[in-house]
């Protein structure tokens, strides 16, 4: 199975894809959307069709106390819209601290601030997807 990982931010969507075996996640690209969700859904649908994706894993931001805040509500709403747009399963994956982990990894790798801004969302999507794949494989 081939998966698409998504990290939905307020202005960008980080994406990652798995290999055909569903074992390894790789950063794909970052899509700027500026809250134009209809266009964003269309772009995701195109990716799903072009790359022959079997399922989507969407990052689900929960608060540290396990409650669902405004960003979590946005992800739930986006998941509903995705399910209406693509005819494949959409799974939620807890994404707490993934962007921080991605940023920390880039800083440790001496990646410049300018470059970090371009890749942090797709790296966060990769972490989200790899976490899901690892959990699924157990």
Spans of features found by a protein language model:
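Phosphate- and other anionic-substrate recognition elements at nucleic-acid/protein interfaces
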Residues: 2-3, 13-138
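Conserved catalytic-loop position in the HRD/HxD motif
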Residues: 7
């Amino acid at each position: 199975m081939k998966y698409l990982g998504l990290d939905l931010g307020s202005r960008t969507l980080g994406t990652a894809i798995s290999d055909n075996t569903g074992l390894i996640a790789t950063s794909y690209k970052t899509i700027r959307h500026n809250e134009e969700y209809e266009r964003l859904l269309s772009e995701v649908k195109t990716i799903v069709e072009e790359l022959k994706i079997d399922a989507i894993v969407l990052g689900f931001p929960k608060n540290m106390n396990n409650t669902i805040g405004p960003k979590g509500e946005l992800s739930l709403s986006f998941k509903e819209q995705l399910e209406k747009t693509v005819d494949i399963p959409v799974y939620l994956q807890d994404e707490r601290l993934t962007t921080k982990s991605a940023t920390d990894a880039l800083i440790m790798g001496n990646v410049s601030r300018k470059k970090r801004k371009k890749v942090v969302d797709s790296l966060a999507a990769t972490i989200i997807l790899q976490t899901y794949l690892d959990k699924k494989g157990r």
